[in-house]
Amino acid sequence: MASGGRADDERRIAVAMDYSASSKRALDWAIANLLRRGDHLVVLHVLHHGGEEAKHALWGKSGSPLIPLSEFRDPTAMQQYGVHCDAEVLDMLDTAARQLELTVVAKLYWGDAREKLCDAVEEQKIDTLVMGSRGLGSIQRILLGSVTNYVLSNASCPVTVVKGK
């Protein structure tokens, strides 16, 4: 057994998901190139605080409870979290879960995506994080900061960045 009571071959792979084209490419890449039979896939969402103060107060730094794929598929259930799931992403998750016998869960956080993604890696004991790159130019990256650059520098696990086509 590995630390934390996990089997040595049990992997926890996370994909940062905001439903943008780049995050969908990251999910597609993880399914095609990284995930293998029996893995745990954690879909990480980070939402801004706006309008979610009650949920933020309830779950604070630790985020939402783990949301199983069956609940993640239910639009009514996901509305309570302020997430509107994308049919393409749900189809990708359903297919991967079935074909690779994955355990798929979602986890929501509220706040700064840079910090929350790094927190999630620690809290969820993620082995590898996959995320998309929006492809900001160098000036935009300097002015706005880059979630990707921050996570690459601060996450405690390997991070794979999937660039756009």
What label would you give each PLM region?
Residues 79, 83-91:
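Short, surface-exposed alpha-helical segments at coil->helix boundaries
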Residues 1-5, 22, 33, 119-165:
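Gly/Ser-rich helix-loop-strand patches that form or flank binding pockets
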Residues 108-116:
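Charged docking surfaces used in two-component/phosphorelay signaling
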